[in-house]
């Protein structure tokens, strides 16, 4: 089923253009109706939050108006993280939650992300149902009046409740750890001081002064250079970086080396496995995780399961087969025993607890994962699906895989949003990986119509 408005993580686009207040109003009406029609309450309850982007309040007001127009009781959380909304929906037993954010994307973008009453992101089927209402020739949704209209109130206590929940996910005092924490000028910025003071970490805040225009700007999990520099200059034990809506976490060791989501999953998974808490001794990853992580997991008696790219698919696999740890190289990491989606601050606390209790440095803990050099080439093609089924391209991939003899891998997949074929290779050396990916890319350009 092809969706027009919803991507892999909600409705997203350039604010006030692709994602206009008018569209936000309609998404509020349609989404609110679909998610609350079976509610037993006279007025179904929906929590609404946003990140720190300048367009957030504009879109929030439009979305809330749409929710009110179908009779919903709206609780505005203010600026709270995406995983904070997911947690509070369950804690407050609300019918749904909405987060207005474009996550790690640049400031001109924004998005609308729904959560069901169970705290999980919506299924493709529910998103399709909402889209059918958005594209209907006539608006057939209810138009209540008088006491049938929705109401709105602020619920700022939600942030405190979420902070308290996070603190309870670890059992170790973090006293003695010196940590630089980059808030990406995003939704975690107002949480960092209270949270990390309460767990007794010696922390140095970085990029925690949002002004509406600086969210993710040369900071946070996608731009860690400032964090790497600050960790070394302050002689900190490690650094932590979040993204704009707080659902990602990456780390930096005491020498300024990046510790990505793969390594964090390995470190936390190994600790959970040692304590008998890693269900089925398995970590769920996407196909983009590095071969070095799989080898490290295997060498320590752990298993892995791969899904397609997108944290929602990781969560689906975890729920389907009873796993409790999974995530992406980008830093979306799901601890399903605690929350229903990737949670940056939760991940940071779990990682810091492992560092503290192990008595080892982050660099030592991450050393088991020897990252294989990786190279990605994008090829523009006319037909992505036909390209994947091209026999000459399949033969070229098979030849390279034969050369690799298990010590490397090739991943060829279509882009989800652009007319591109993505060719990725991993191998023990940069020279080998470049040779492998070039060999396949050359064949793709020769045999695929319109390839360049």
From Swiss-Prot:
The lineage of its organism: Bacteria, Bacillati, Bacillota, Bacilli, Lactobacillales. GO terms for molecular function: magnesium ion binding; phosphoglucosamine mutase activity; phosphomannomutase activity. This is Phosphoglucosamine mutase. It comes from the Bacteria. It catalyses: alpha-D-glucosamine 1-phosphate = D-glucosamine 6-phosphate. The active site is at residue 103. GO terms for biological process: carbohydrate metabolic process; peptidoglycan biosynthetic process; UDP-N-acetylglucosamine biosynthetic process. Binds 1 Mg(2+) ion per subunit. It is an enzyme of class 5 (isomerase). GO terms for cellular component: cytosol. Keywords: Isomerase, Magnesium, Metal-binding, Phosphoprotein. It holds the Pfam family PGM_PMM_I. Activated by phosphorylation. Its EC number is 5.4.2.10. It comes from Limosilactobacillus fermentum (strain NBRC 3956 / LMG 18251). Mg(2+) binds at residues 103, 243, 245, 247. Belongs to the phosphohexose mutase family.
């Amino acid at each position: 089923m092809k969706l027009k408005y919803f991507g892999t993580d909600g409705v997203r686009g350039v604010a006030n253009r692709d994602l206009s207040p008018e569209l936000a109003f309609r998404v509020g009406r349609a989404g609110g109706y679909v998610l609350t029609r079976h509610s037993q309450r006279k007025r179904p309850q929906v929590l609404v939050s946003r990140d720190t982007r300048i367009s957030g309040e504009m879109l929030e007001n439009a979305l809330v108006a749409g929710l009110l127009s179908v009779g919903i009781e709206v609780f505005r959380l203010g600026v709270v993280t995406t995983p904070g909304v997911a947690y509070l929906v369950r804690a407050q037993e609300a019918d749904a939650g909405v987060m207005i954010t474009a996550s790690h994307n640049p400031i001109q973008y924004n998005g609308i992300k729904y959560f069901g009453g169970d705290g999980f992101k919506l299924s493709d089927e529910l998103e399709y149902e909402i889209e059918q209402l958005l594209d209907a020739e006539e608006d057939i949704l209810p138009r209540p009046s008088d006491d049938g209209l929705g109401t709105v109130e602020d619920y700022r206590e939600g942030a405190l409740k979420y902070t308290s929940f996070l603190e309870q996910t670890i059992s170790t005092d973090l006293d003695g750890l010196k940590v630089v924490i980059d808030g990406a000028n995003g939704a975690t910025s107002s949480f960092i001081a209270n949270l990390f003071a309460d767990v007794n970490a010696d922390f140095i805040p970085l990029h925690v002064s949002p002004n509406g225009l600086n969210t993710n700007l040369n900071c946070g999990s996608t731009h860690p250079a400032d964090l790497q520099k600050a960790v070394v200059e302050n002689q900190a034990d490690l650094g932590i970086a979040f993204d704009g809506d707080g659902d990602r976490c990456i780390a930096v060791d005491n020498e300024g080396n990046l510790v990505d989501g793969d390594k964090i999953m390995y470190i936390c998974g190994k600790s959970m496995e040692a304590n008998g808490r890693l269900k089925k001794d398995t970590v769920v990853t996407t196909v983009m995780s590095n071969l070095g992580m799989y080898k490290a997991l295997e060498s320590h008696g752990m298993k892995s399961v791969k899904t397609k790219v997108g944290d929602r698919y990781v969560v689906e696999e975890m729920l389907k087969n009873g796993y409790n740890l999974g995530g992406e190289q980008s830093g979306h990491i799901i601890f399903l025993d605690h929350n229903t989606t990737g949670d940056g601050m939760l991940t940071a606390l779990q990682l810091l607890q492992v560092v503290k209790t192990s008595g080892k440095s982050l660099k030592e803990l991450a050393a088991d994962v020897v990252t294989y050099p990786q190279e990605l080439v994008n090829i523009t093609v006319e037909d992505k699906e036909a390209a994947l089924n091209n026999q000459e391209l399949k033969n070229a991939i098979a030849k390279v895989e034969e050369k690799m003899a298990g010590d490397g891998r090739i991943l060829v997949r279509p882009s989800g949003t652009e007319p591109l074929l993505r060719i990725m290779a991993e191998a023990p050396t940069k020279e080998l990986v470049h040779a492998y990916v070039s060999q396949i890319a050359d064949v793709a350009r020769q045999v695929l119509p319109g390839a360049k």
